Curated annotation (Swiss-Prot):
SUPFAM superfamilies linked: DNA repair protein MutS, domain III, P-loop containing nucleoside triphosphate hydrolases, SMR domain-like
Protein name, entry field: Endonuclease MutS2
Lineage: Bacteria, Bacillati, Bacillota, Bacilli, Bacillales
CDD domains: ABC_MutS2
SMART domains per UniProt: MUTSac, MUTSd, SMR
Top EC group: hydrolase
UniProtKB keywords: ATP-binding, DNA-binding, Endonuclease, Hydrolase, Nuclease, Nucleotide-binding, RNA-binding, rRNA-binding
Organism of provenance: Staphylococcus aureus (strain NCTC 8325 / PS 47)
Known role: Endonuclease that is involved in the suppression of homologous recombination and thus may have a key role in the control of bacterial genetic diversity.
Amino acid sequence: MRQKTLDVLEFEKIKSLVANETISDLGLEKVNQMMPATNFETVVFQMEETDEIAQIYNKHRLPSLSGLSKVSAFIHRADIGGVLNVSELNLIKRLIQVQNQFKTFYNQLVEEDEGVKYPILDDKMNQLPVLTDLFQQINETCDTYDLYDNASYELQGIRSKISSTNQRIRQNLDRIVKSQANQKKLSDAIVTVRNERNVIPVKAEYRQDFNGIVHDQSASGQTLYIEPSSVVEMNNQISRLRHDEAIEKERILTQLTGYVAADKDALLVAEQVMGQLDFLIAKARYSRSIKGTKPIFKEDRTVYLPKAYHPLLNRETVVANTIEFMEDIETVIITGPNTGGKTVTLKTLGLIIVMAQSGLLIPTLDGSQLSVFKNVYCDIGDEQSIEQSLSTFSSHMTNIVEILKHADKHSLVLFDELGAGTDPSEGAALAMSILDHVRKIGSLVMATTHYPELKAYSYNREGVMNASVEFDVDTLSPTYKLLMGVPGRSNAFDISKKLGLSLNIINKAKTMIGTDEKEINEMIESLERNYKRVETQRLELDRLVKEAEQVHDDLSKQYQQFQNYEKSLIEEAKEKANQKIKAATKEADDIIKDLRQLREQKGADVKEHELIDKKKRLDDHYEAKSIKQNVQKQKYDKIVAGDEVKVLSYGQKGEVLEIVNDEEAIVQMGIIKMKLPIEDLEKKQKEKVKPTKMVTRQNRQTIKTELDLRGYRYEDALIELDQYLDQAVLSNYEQVYIIHGKGTGALQKGVQQHLKKHKSVSDFRGGMPSEGGFGVTVATLK
């Protein structure tokens, strides 16, 4: 966008306020570079960036960025062979520390805000490199001011020698200054330093009493700073040690600089990301100060700013107005009194668009909508008196000519007092002609004017809407309220009456104006009244909509909570049912053991009623509501003895042995016979006779040691296998042969997997060639 536009709209002041919120020179640099983008995707992304950080900033305490500085110059110097000093290394260390703290904060944030996504910040955190080793190397080698003594073995030895030598020098000099004989010869009984040498202050007249080197004298010349000869050699030794220390420090710093150079790319990424975060946090801080909101950007041309206000004005006193280009409206003409807020409205619209396209939240209520403009053109200036018409008019017209050269359908054009500064009739004609031209170009236009001719401009042109700033006749002052769709009317008669002008004069003046103009003023007055009524209703409607949305949100949350509660109850019921089934399964195992014992005790003579009594113990463990399937009354023909049925509550097949009455029947399920409700039975359709049918007899002599499952469907084969194994166990068989055939191998695999889980099977193997080979599985029973 043109710099002139940004200057007129005072965007630099906004940037200055954002800059005040930055912590580092990195963030400050990015604020100074901040400009409105014109690419739709870029504008949307910048706004998403700011809004995401603002959401986090408004809910959480962000880690401090204090001490973050620009270090790219140090990194580049390290890369070309320069040596960094301790201060520069500490700034690099602080960069790493800040990024690590932000990483930790983000990880905690993700854990706390479970389900909330921060995709942009997540991407930035993923960009941050791991620099733990470099941080530790710097941190363990130096503090804020100097290298640690133990930074190297050599440095520690040198500094130890310096310390011990200094101590000897001090002891020597202390004896001199504390000597009673020397008290009157010294200016002060202290040891001081001159030119990095330990000296004592001697009065000039006693110079001959002290052997040594004079290093300095006082301004008056009355005190000489003498290095006694007794410590000259020790001071020389200190100088040599200081030189050795400097060489060792240079070596250590060179080594650390090498580590920095090795991580140069990672450090530059860290600097870039943290600088961007400082910039975004500054935007978020400023946005909160103006209670900024996130606009929705539209591909088509849209401007809707609910209760917008100028961010540079005092928020406590400024009047917020809704600025809107309604559907199919391309031009808005604002009329009204001087100092009524027309110019502020233009600047508010222009500045908000510039802010939004720079990624700043805007000072409006929620729900604002904007399109992205390639450029914003302004002709806004202070009003001048008619005596300055030539300079004022020429200045405005020069600017307008420049605007008309460059404006297009992607532009927003703001005209303040269009056509002002010349003859009113010519100015009004020019204003209408200029507006026609800009509308033909396709630009979106908002213009302010004094000319009454422009009030009628919208009535014979499509896409043009009037607006006005309200004037309070009672207080004789503007209210600064913007009335969209209502042209401004003249208040001269009302103001004059309020100020005490004679009614005769006012009434005579009214007869001098045309009937049409009088009717227009009355129409405008009626429009103002209707606008206020509609605006009041709209505000009430907005309030009701918000209340409805809140109720909807509350109900949605309650419904979700109810669903979660219902789900938890179902899960709890399932868990209880599973526990019951587990207990029932164990009970079934006990029944089988009891049956074995009965068989051993009574041989093959196991009475039916004993078996049913044992099974009844299993039935008692099932609760119909918790583990039964959804039972529906059978829809087939009437069930009679001999029918094959499915027992719904157990999901098992059976055969009806006897109909006890209209409600109950005795059913044989495998080796178990039970009395069941008829409504719990579902009649099975007759199937073709299979080669092998289920074994129902329990005599050991009639149960074969082999089961032929060839021709069975997968599910039926497993049911048949279960029944057979139960009977084989009761017959005390140790080994049985399951014939499944070779085929595709699916039945073989299913049989063997089932045997692996069956509690009565201790082992199984494939058949030997003499036993049938791969078409047979041999199972060993427990």
